[in-house]
Regions:
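N-terminal hydrophobic targeting segments
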Residues: 73-131
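Structural preference for beta-strand elements that scaffold enzyme active sites
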Residues: 3-6, 34-36, 56-58, 80-82, ...
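Catalytic cores of alpha/beta
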Residues: 1, 22, 37-59, 64, ...
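Glycine/small-residue-rich hydrophobic helix-like segments
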Residues: 2-40
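N-terminal active-site wall of soluble small-molecule enzyme domains
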Residues: 1, 22-25, 105-168
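Glycine-rich phosphate-binding active-site loops on the catalytic face of alpha/beta enzymes
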Residues: 7-15, 41, 53-73, 100-113, ...
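C-terminal helical cap(s) of enzyme catalytic domains, especially alpha/beta-barrels
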Residues: 19, 24-28, 51, 63-81, ...
Length: 171
């Protein structure tokens, strides 16, 4: 008569994890019960795939292993969405508040969404993972901007050569 039923995806003898365990067993549980899928959930895709079978998820080790619990939880719930073209602190905060994981900063002067690296420093107060968008910029500019702003990723939108990309990767 339990109202909440947990389905452990971990085999306690071998410690292997099989997320299909939830799919196989959930169909045997009465529909008026709350089903919790336990163990092995580590991505938004896992949550999406198991949502038709479970009402909730027990996630522990994936979150505990994260350096940033808030971002790890955000990624698990919303996935890794990027809102690009952020130019103001208010816009960056709104993107974060709405579930964004990445914030895109466009360092292409010809773009109407351009932000100068100096102005972008203010946006770093928002706990997003920031991505710098560059187009045919010098390697030195890209590297200096990435370092100054602690960018999590670099996105190239120009005609950068394979050699340019390889040199960028080496840094």
């Amino acid at each position: 008569d339990a109202q909440v039923i947990g389905i452990n995806n971990r085999d306690l003898h071998t410690l292997t994890v099989d997320l299909d365990t939830t799919k196989k067993l959930a169909v045997k549980i009465p529909e008026d019960r709350i089903v919790i899928s336990e163990s092995g959930i580590s991505s938004h895709d896992d949550v999406e795939n198991l949502s038709p079978y479970a009402d909730g998820f027990l996630v522990g080790s994936h979150l505990v292993a994260s350096d940033n619990l808030a971002l790890a939880l955000r990624e698990l719930i919303f996935g890794t969405h990027k809102v690009c073209g952020l130019k103001t602190l208010e816009a960056a905060q709104a993107a974060y508040d709405c579930g964004a994981y990445y914030g895109g900063l466009i360092f292409v002067e010809a773009s109407p969404r351009y932000i100068a690296p100096e102005a972008a420093k203010e946006l770093m107060a928002v706990p997003l993972n920031f991505v710098g968008v560059f187009q045919n910029a010098s390697l030195e500019f890209v590297l200096a901007t990435a370092e100054d702003l602690s960018l999590k990723a670099i996105q190239l939108h120009g005609e950068e050569s394979h050699d340019y990309i390889e040199r960028l990767r080496e840094k």
